[in-house]
Design a protein with these regions (language model features):
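Short beta-strand segments at enzyme active-site cores
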Residues: 3-6, 67, 141-144
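Helix N-cap / loop-to-helix initiation motif
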Residues: 1-3, 115-116
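N-terminal extracellular/periplasmic Venus flytrap/periplasmic-binding protein-like
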Residues: 119-194
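Flexible glycine-/small-residue-enriched beta->alpha junction loops
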Residues: 54, 58-111
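Conserved catalytic cysteine-centered active-site region
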Residues: 5, 9-63, 96-103, 167-193
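Active-site-proximal alpha-helical scaffold in enzymes
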Residues: 39-70, 109, 113-139
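Glycine-rich nucleotide phosphate-binding loop and flanking beta-alpha elements
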Residues: 13, 72-74, 131, 193-194
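Short, well-ordered secondary-structure micro-motifs
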Residues: 17-18, 76-78, 157-161
């Protein structure tokens, strides 16, 4: 019996809302008695879901728990200039410049100036090449779980990590925009993917 379901989603609105952990459990066909909850911890949400449930298993509170994260970027209400609650800003409960991991990464570059964009880009290209080689050498496949995914054209089985970009080059990295700051360091190429 599954004891709990923890699911992270950064923007808990629409079909990512409604306590996504509980909703996921019900839609997966788990018994109504299985609870579920949502975590919103920005980019670290899924990792928090895994560590929280693993800790509960470790202390004996759970025997079995499910953990994960969902982000459906097409469902995010972007472009509406939706600011945080003004009270948060006036009472300094939230730093508006620290609301996402992209700005956090830029601040790391500020703190460690030796971590240049060129070094970050080179690391990212190397990481992509290592991932592609590991996949080619069948080292990743044992850890991959096929997932059924629906689309407008029907259902298909996703069996491969879609985030690997073995064709990445340092030259290509130079052309990527820095969305968090003008002349920043962080791009879609050297940041952690969604």
């Amino acid at each position: 019996m599954i004891d709990d379901v923890a699911v992270a989603a950064t923007t808990q609105t629409g079909d990512q809302g409604l306590t996504i952990g509980r909703t996921s459990a019900i839609l997966a066909g788990l018994p109504q008695s299985v609870p579920g909850y949502a975590i919103d911890r920005m980019c670290a949400g899924a990792m928090t879901a895994v560590t929280t449930t693993a800790s509960a298993i470790g202390i004996g509170a759970y025997d079995i728990a499910l953990a994960g994260g969902v982000e459906h970027m097409g469902r995010h209400p972007m472009g509406f200039d939706a600011d945080p609650n003004p009270r948060f800003l006036s009472e300094k409960l939230v730093n508006p410049e620290a609301l996402n991991m992209g700005n956090t990464a830029e601040k790391i570059h500020d703190r460690y100036p030796q971590l240049t964009k060129e070094r970050a880009d080179a690391f990212a290209v190397g990481s992509q090449q290592k991932a592609a080689k590991a996949y080619q050498d069948n080292k990743i496949q044992p850890d991959l779980v096929p997932v059924s995914a629906g689309s407008e054209s029907g259902w298909s089985l996703v069996t491969k990590d879609e985030l690997m970009r073995p064709e990445s080059t340092l030259e290509g990295m130079k052309d990527l925009k820095t969305p968090f700051r003008p002349h920043g360091q962080v791009t879609a190429g050297n940041a952690s993917p969604l």
